[in-house]
Amino acid sequence: GTNDILQGRDSTYVYKTLVKAIELASTKGTVIIGLETQIDSDMDGLDLVVREVNEQLKAYAEAHNIKVIDFYTTLFEADQIGQIVFAGEVHPNERGYRLMAYKALEVFTRL
């Protein structure tokens, strides 16, 4: 998703592509959707596209009774209190990945 956004694709395109992947994965078993992470510096307003995709994914997940791991909010909140969670514009650093792992574990333990 994020790579498509960085290449200038809009939220509708990214969402439809991700839904195709979700539907394919669901034929193999339980699916959990991990929301896209923020784009750290909001390059050219691209973080807005990430947020739009995530809102669409949340609605899809709710309609299809699929669990969601909200990686976006996890990293956004850490970033807002001054934690350095990115190793560049898009990829989390060690702390960011650790926070994401904790969030995933929180969701997995409630299955």
Each predicted region: which residue ranges?
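Catalytic His-Asp segment of secreted/periplasmic serine-dependent ester chemistry enzymes
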Residues: Q38-L111
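Charged helix-capping and loop-helix junction motifs
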Residues: S11-V19, V49-N54
